[in-house]
Design a protein with these regions (language model features):
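Hydrophobic beta-strand-centered segment that forms part of the acyl-chain substrate-binding groove
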Residues: 30-65, 90
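Charged, low-complexity, helix/coiled-coil-prone segments
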Residues: 4-9, 23, 105-113
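Non-catalytic surface loops within mature trypsin-like serine protease
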Residues: 8-10, 54, 99-101
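Mid-length scaffold segments of soluble, non-membrane domains
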Residues: 24-28
């Protein structure tokens, strides 16, 4: 599992006083991707869905949690949730990520001069 504590500020506002759904979804995507990578699976998003239950207030700490549910060949299925510290659920997400060839990432790194390292991967 991977966790992230997030506080959405005024620049992430959608409805008055609440976070924009796109900002909420972007964190889900990033966290599910990070969950793959820190577990040794260099993967990219194929698709994800977000289900919203209630608006997320601005300027309040919320907690994201993501976990890998299944690995089938090069397909990695994940689930995630967004709650507050009293356990109130704001949203959930499901994602499908595709395992990538780390050598191709390294080649792209050299070609673009991005200077990205992958110390957590053993491949």
């Amino acid at each position: 599992q991977v966790y992230a504590e997030v506080l959405f500020g005024r620049l992430a506002q959608g409805p008055p006083g609440h976070a924009h759904g796109g900002a909420i979804s972007a964190v889900f995507d990033e966290l599910m991707g990070a969950c793959c990578w820190v577990n040794g699976y260099p993967a990219m998003t194929a698709q994800y869905t977000t289900r919203f239950f209630k608006p997320v207030p601005l300027n309040e700490d919320v907690l994201y949690c993501a976990e890998i549910k299944e690995i089938d060949g090069n397909k990695i299925s994940l689930k995630a949730q967004l709650i507050n510290y009293t356990g109130e659920q704001f949203a959930t997400a499901k994602g499908l990520f595709i395992l990538q060839d780390i050598e191709k990432f390294k080649e792209m790194n050299l070609e673009t001069g991005a200077n990205v390292t992958y110390p957590h991967l053993t491949q």
